[in-house]
């Protein structure tokens, strides 16, 4: 009878743990969807961007680019990034077709070679043009491409945030997981910790200066990617 009681207790305890886990997963997904909705609905947009690369000695290199975005709700958003300066990267272009399921598609145009190169899914993880951003970072982060788990509540720079974990479903992703801080008030993403294939926290992405355009669409004025 004691063995039966212990076994029954263990089963109930196991079911309780699974129930909590499922609840946290659903809550994490719900928060991710709210953050995605705050970005969605724009249709298409054009943006002028400036990238500042800072090395360990403090020297700064400036790059100027343009980005065109096209929203495709039934599949995944598309983007075209074209570098305008400095001279050594002028004309370099990245075309990204994100997909809600399956691998994203990316093409790289190199003016020196005068040809377009399709980027293999497993080759999108390294630093792009000497920056801390990878080609994977430059593609849209569709909600469906991750599994989620709610972790905790936490204050980040005086903002009350929900902290969630998302795990890429793409087997070729350069990340094993990402820890994401989403403001409770907005809800907007303010920070992401990126973990590499060895589960080491090697990059932190920070979003600052959110501005609302057309009284509807929130966009950060600055995105910092810090390599640890």
Residue positions per predicted region:
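Gly/Pro-enriched, hydrophobic low-complexity segments
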Residues: 33, 84, 95-97, 105-109, ...
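Boundary at the C-terminal end of the N-terminal hydrophobic targeting segment
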Residues: 20-22
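Bacterial N-terminal signal peptides
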Residues: 8-18
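Short acidic/glycine-enriched loop/turn segments that link adjacent beta-strands
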Residues: 75, 157-160
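Bacterial N-terminal signal peptides that target proteins for export
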Residues: 1-9
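Surface-exposed beta-loop interaction hotspot
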Residues: 140-147, 153
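N-terminal mature ectodomain segment of secretory-pathway/periplasmic proteins
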Residues: 27-112
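Short amphipathic beta-strand and strand-loop transition segments with alternating hydrophobic
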Residues: 68-70, 149-155, 208-210
């Amino acid at each position: 009878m004691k063995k039966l009681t212990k076994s029954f207790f263990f089963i109930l305890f196991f079911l309780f743990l699974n129930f909590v886990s499922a609840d946290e997963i659903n809550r994490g997904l719900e928060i991710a969807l709210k953050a995605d909705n705050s970005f969605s609905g724009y249709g298409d947009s054009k943006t002028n961007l400036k990238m500042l690369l800072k090395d360990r000695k403090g020297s700064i290199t400036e790059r100027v680019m343009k980005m065109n975005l096209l929203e495709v709700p039934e599949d995944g958003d598309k983007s075209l990034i074209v570098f305008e300066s400095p001279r050594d990267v002028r004309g370099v272009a990245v075309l990204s077709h994100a997909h809600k399921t399956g691998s994203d598609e990316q093409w790289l145009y190199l003016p020196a070679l005068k040809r377009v190169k399709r980027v293999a899914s497993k080759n999108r993880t390294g630093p792009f043009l000497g920056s801390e951003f990878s080609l994977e970072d430059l593609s849209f982060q569709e909600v469906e491409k991750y599994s989620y788990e709610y972790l905790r509540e936490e204050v980040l720079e005086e903002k009350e945030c929900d902290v969630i974990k998302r795990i890429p479903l793409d087997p070729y992703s350069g990340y094993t997981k990402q820890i994401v801080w989403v403001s409770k008030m907005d809800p907007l993403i303010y920070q992401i910790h990126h973990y590499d294939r060895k589960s080491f926290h090697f990059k932190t992405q920070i979003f600052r200066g959110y501005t609302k355009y057309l009284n509807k669409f929130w966009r950060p004025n600055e995105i910092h990617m810090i390599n640890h």
